[in-house]
């Protein structure tokens, strides 16, 4: 993760993310739970845990869960939410995703939900996942993705970067699959969904100034018709509703 920018954004706005409905629970978490139904894991790791909502979910099917994040205030939120949820088997560790302080071939399950687009070295992160997973261990990726169309890809990522300086890239599904294959992680199940957002709360979470908020808002209002259609952009009352495409992937270490 882009450590300094991410720590500033998420550290300053940890409580806002802890109370964000799309981070607490959305379709992606429901899909993860369905993909993992019937499993029981000894050791699980949630990377980029944020306020710990995914870690809490997998704690119900895991003996031990490590919740990992580079930002201390977010880990404090994880502690609070895990106590509220009576999830006593969650411990927190502070590290960046590309450097995971865990021994090789020791983890049964890794989850990463809504965090991968902040990792500057996503390739290195996936390599780390492959290293620490046991053979036939499971990696779950749930993240907003970019369309394969170059125009849509550029518009989405530019907007995200203007709203959030810690944003690195919403990757195309083809990019993610290429990296997974490189490190012997085979996708056995995947589902596409949408992350539904409202402009005001989406921008306010990152603490941008009022003038810059207006600047970003105009880009939504003045977007080309094909962009509005692709991202379901529509004005309602004094807000703008839109959605990003999201992929949920279940991968198995094959060597």
Segments from the language model and where they lie:
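Conserved class I S-adenosyl-L-methionine
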Residues: 1-39, 53-57, 74-77, 140-162, 201-203, ...
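Class I SAM-dependent methyltransferase SAM/SAH-binding core
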Residues: 45-99
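A conserved beta-strand element that flanks and buttresses the S-adenosyl-L-methionine
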Residues: 111
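Short catalytic micro-motifs in class I SAM-dependent methyltransferases
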Residues: 114-115
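A short glycine-rich, Lys/Arg-flanked "PGG" loop and its adjoining helix->strand segment in the class I
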Residues: 123-138
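Short alpha-helix
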Residues: 169-184
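Conserved Class I S-adenosyl-L-methionine
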Residues: 188-255
């Amino acid at each position: 993760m882009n450590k300094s920018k991410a720590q500033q954004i998420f550290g300053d706005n940890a409580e806002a993310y802890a109370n964000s409905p799309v981070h607490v629970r959305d379709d992606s978490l429901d899909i993860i739970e369905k993909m993992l139904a019937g499993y029981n894991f000894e050791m699980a790791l949630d990377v980029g845990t944020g306020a710990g909502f995914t870690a809490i979910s997998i704690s119900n099917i895991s003996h031990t869960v490590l919740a990992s994040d580079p930002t201390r205030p977010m880990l404090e939120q994880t502690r609070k939410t895990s106590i509220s949820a009576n999830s006593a088997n969650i411990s927190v560790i502070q590290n960046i995703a590309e450097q995971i302080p865990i021994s090789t071939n020791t983890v049964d399950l890794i989850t990463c939900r809504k965090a991968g687009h902040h990792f500057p070295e996503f390739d290195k992160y996936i390599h780390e996942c492959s290293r620490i997973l046991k053979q036939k261990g499971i990696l779950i990726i749930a993240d907003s993705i970019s369309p394969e169309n170059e125009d849509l890809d550029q518009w989405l990522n530019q907007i995200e970067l203007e709203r959030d300086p810690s944003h690195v890239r919403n990757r195309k599904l083809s990019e993610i699959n290429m990296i997974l294959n490189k490190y012997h992680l085979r996708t056995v199940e995947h589902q596409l969904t949408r992350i539904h957002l409202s402009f005001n709360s989406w921008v306010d979470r990152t603490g941008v100034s009022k003038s810059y908020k207006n600047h970003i808002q105009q880009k939504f209002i003045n977007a080309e018709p094909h962009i509005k259609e692709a991202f379901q952009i529509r004005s309602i009352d004094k807000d703008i509703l839109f959605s990003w495409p999201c992929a949920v992937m279940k991968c198995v270490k094959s060597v």
